[in-house]
């Protein structure tokens, strides 16, 4: 889900609800400028902002941390843990190619992650 920075919190929440996703990538043209999440919506409401006329640009996470398509699951989980994020945009150069969330790792077997970590450490 991508939206422009002028989209409102209400519009973003509606689209996120329709698509059953927890985040929207905020784009200016083809450039990622931020991430808007359900947590950002709660924060905006807690501050007393009106979701009908509050633009995403004023409440989104600017210049979000990103990962590349060749990052490992461990890399993504470590970065989410270190930064306190639940969602990470995936950029190939400057082009948004996807998003990964903590939920994507639910049900992933710990053994498989440990296997990947061991392999990664042997490569490096």
Q: Which residues does each PLM region occupy?
A:
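A glycine-centered beta-loop-beta connector
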Residues: 16-19, 24-40, 80, 88-104
């Amino acid at each position: 889900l991508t939206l422009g920075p002028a989209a409102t919190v209400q519009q973003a929440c509606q689209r996120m609800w329709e698509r059953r996703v927890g985040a929207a990538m905020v784009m200016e043209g083809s450039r990622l400028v931020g991430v808007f999440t359900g947590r950002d919506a709660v924060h905006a409401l807690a501050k007393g902002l009106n979701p009908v006329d509050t633009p995403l640009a004023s409440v989104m996470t600017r210049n979000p941390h990103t990962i590349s398509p060749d990052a490992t699951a461990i890399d993504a989980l470590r970065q989410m843990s270190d930064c306190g994020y639940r969602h990470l945009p995936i950029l190939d150069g400057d082009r948004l190619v996807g998003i990964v969330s903590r939920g994507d790792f639910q049900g992933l077997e710990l053994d498989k992650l440990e296997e990947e970590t061991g392999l990664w450490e042997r490569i490096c």
